[in-house]
């Protein structure tokens, strides 16, 4: 994953790629999933905050069916109070906002654009902006994207998908 981002501080997203075809010296791969590293996930957990998790199954325009999971925490606003908990109704509203945002953004992007969007954290920023009116949240991350169903590509389609995209050794 170090090849996907410029800074190692942002290398906590672990992408999985599945090898499909070997053509000459090139290995053609397809997206197989993404998850946060265990170190990053463990560092997010905090006391005196409410954890909100959401998950949704979404179909991309290029035929993938993905299961995306998201996590977020309430943000401490008052410096005098130790805890910052959310009521159940607020948690449900935040969860619905997370689900709707993930569904909208994933269903409108093909898998290559989705990977670049995940790396640039635009989905997380969009979720934080949508939840501003409900309750302040922070540490929002897409924790996992699992491929439920992937389209079957021919060799020609794979070569067309990989045109102009090479990773040097």
Language model features by range: what are they?
Residues 1-86:
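Hydrophobic-cavity lipid-handling domains and compact docking modules
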Residues 92-169:
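Positively charged, low-complexity, intrinsically disordered RNA-binding extensions
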């Amino acid at each position: 994953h170090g090849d996907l981002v410029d800074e190692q501080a942002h290398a906590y997203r672990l992408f999985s790629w599945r090898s499909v075809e070997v053509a000459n010296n090139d290995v053609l791969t397809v997206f197989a999933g993404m998850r946060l590293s265990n170190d990053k996930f463990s560092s997010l957990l905090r006391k005196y905050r409410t954890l909100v998790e959401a998950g949704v199954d979404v179909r991309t325009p290029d035929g993938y069916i993905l299961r995306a999971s998201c996590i977020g925490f309430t943000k401490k606003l008052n410096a005098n109070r130790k805890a910052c908990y959310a009521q159940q109704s607020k948690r449900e509203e935040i969860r619905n906002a997370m689900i709707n945002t993930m569904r909208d953004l994933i269903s409108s992007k093909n898998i290559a654009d989705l990977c670049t969007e995940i790396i640039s954290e635009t989905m997380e920023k969009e979720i934080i902006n949508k939840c501003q009116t409900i309750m302040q949240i922070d540490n929002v991350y897409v924790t996992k994207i699992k491929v439920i169903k992937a389209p079957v590509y021919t060799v020609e389609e794979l070569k067309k998908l990989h045109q102009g995209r090479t990773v040097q050794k």
